[in-house]
Structure formats: C-alpha cells, structure tokens
Amino acid sequence: MYVIAHHRFTNPPTAFERGIRLIRNEGAPAGTTGLQFYPSSDASQAICLWESDSVADVQAYVDDTLGDASVNSCWEVDGEQAFADRPLGLQPSAAVRG
C-alpha cells in the first residue's frame, strides 16, 4: 500500500537532521520504503509518500526517527482516487540518498 506522512516540524533544523535517516531508509521496517519527499519552501512542514505493509509501520518509524522535532500524521492513500505524474525539475531519489 501507499502511505502519506504529513510532518509539521516543531524544530525544523533538528527534524531535517534526523530526517536524513528517513530519506536513506535507515532502520525502516521491512517492506517500508520512502518514495517521495516534498518539504515546504519555509521548512515548516513536509509531505512524504511511502510504500509499506501498514500505516502503523510508517507512523511508528517517522515518530521514532523525528521524535519531538515533528508532529506526524499518516494515512493510507486511496488508490482508486489518487493519480501521479513525475514532476519535472525534481531530482531522482538516488541523487539525495547517497
């Protein structure tokens, strides 16, 4: 399934520092992979798209990783209603995962 994680950063510098683990999928539960990362231009929040076996796995992973630097809400994507095209001008994940 696909899962959205909406992050509202309470401490953006700390959240971005800790979030490197999320971007690299370090310590992610089995079957859980980050696919897309969309931070706001003011660094106050971000939306991420995950592929996972469960919403609970993503919720626990982002909560444990970001800690008190972010308030996170996760939900399953409704695949019947959702759509996607690759946004032009965004770098591929391999460019930021190192």
Predicted regions located by residue number:
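Short S/T/G/P-rich N-terminal loop/turn motif that feeds into the first structured element of a domain
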Residues: 1-45, 53-57, 61, 77-98
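A common structural junction motif
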Residues: 27-28, 65-73
